[in-house]
């Protein structure tokens, strides 16, 4: 919705350059990857014909919204993450991984592209003392099965 927030030092130089030298981690948009809420609703409900009763849209930065809604979200079979930056990816993993069922899948869109996304997942594995096999999707995306 708001687009990407500022990256942090963990995201590396390429992310800082992409954000036009904004890299303090402020939860303010850098005006990249913006997706207005009305556009998202149009795609979901008008174009894809997804039943509105099956979708709950929560607007807000991951850091602010996920801690408040992770219990409400419930069990997850496939968790697809596309947060680009370290902090966005890390907060999603920290808040939603426990919701993923054993044998469920975690898909990370930016592992092979953004330094911060890769760092967040690698650190998460170390913290959790897990080492699942990462399966490459393409040049940037990977997925793994929750052990």
Predicted regions and their residues:
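S-adenosylmethionine/decaboxylated-SAM
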Residues: 1-147
């Amino acid at each position: 919705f708001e687009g990407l927030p500022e990256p942090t030092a963990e995201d590396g130089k390429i992310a800082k350059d992409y954000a036009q030298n904004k890299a303090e981690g402020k939860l303010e948009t850098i005006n990249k990857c913006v997706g207005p809420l009305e556009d998202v609703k149009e795609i979901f409900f008008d174009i894809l014909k997804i039943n509105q009763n099956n979708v709950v849209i929560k607007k807000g930065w991951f850091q602010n919204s996920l801690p408040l809604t992770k219990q409400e979200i419930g069990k997850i079979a496939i968790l697809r993450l596309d947060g680009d930056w370290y902090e966005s990816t890390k907060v999603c993993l920290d808040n939603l991984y426990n919701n993923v069922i054993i044998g469920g899948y975690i898909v990370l869109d930016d592992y092979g592209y953004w330094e911060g996304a890769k760092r967040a997942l690698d650190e998460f594995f170390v913290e959790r003392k897990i080492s699942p096999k990462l399966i490459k999707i393409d040049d940037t995306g990977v997925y793994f099965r929750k052990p």
